[in-house]
Amino acid sequence: MDPASSPNPASASFAPAGFPSDTDEDGVSPGYIVPEIIVTEPAWRRHIPHADRLIRRVARAAGSTADCVVLSCDRDVRRLNARHRGKDKPTNVLTFEPVGMPGAEGGEIVLALGVVLREAKAARKRPVHHLAHLLVHGVLHLHGHDHHHAGDARRMEAEEARIMRSLGMPNPWKRS
């Protein structure tokens, strides 16, 4: 995907950081989309050094359809959140379906480093575990999951916990 020509809001102004392989070590398509990883906030590498590996692990475990994961900063996520959701504040994760193709595979997940770190600290969680949870959360949104109603929220939380368990990570909904 060429972010400069992308109609999607998150990658439209960002330069690519690299293109991971779309096959596994045996040359077989893995059954999930290996997302392009764009790092627009270099501090991600300091706080979560192997975020790229984690993104690929989560993509595999969650059956990701995301074309792109953007590791961004609070300022840029705040702008996106204001423009697309009318909320003038940063949020932890935003997801964008493919433009003009509701229900189609693909889409983007954008994360704000400052929010992710503050939330992890407040919840006494390791930042890598919180990032994994937010990636799973974003993938589930791209799969059509929602949490606007209590029943939907419970189902989404249960699926998040199941995927996190498959990754060998703690249930994000249990207090430690």
Swiss-Prot record:
Give the binding site residues for Zn(2+). Answer: H137, H141, H147
Q: Name one GO cellular component term.
A: cytoplasm
Tell me, in one coarse class, where this protein mainly resides: cytoplasm
Gene Ontology terms describing biological process: rRNA processing
Q: Where in the cell is it found?
A: Cytoplasm
Q: Which SUPFAM superfamilies does the UniProt record give?
A: Metalloproteases ('zincins'), catalytic domain
Q: Which GO terms describe its molecular function?
A: metalloendopeptidase activity; RNA endonuclease activity; zinc ion binding
Keywords assigned by UniProt, alphabetized = Cytoplasm, Endonuclease, Hydrolase, Metal-binding, Nuclease, Ribosome biogenesis, rRNA processing, Zinc
- Residue stretches of biased makeup (Low complexity): 1-21
Q: Which cofactor does it need?
A: Zn(2+)
Q: What role does it play?
A: Single strand-specific metallo-endoribonuclease involved in late-stage 70S ribosome quality control and in maturation of the 3' terminus of the 16S rRNA.
User: What's the protein name?
Assistant: Endoribonuclease YbeY
**Lineage, broadest ranks:** Bacteria, Pseudomonadati, Pseudomonadota, Alphaproteobacteria, Acetobacterales
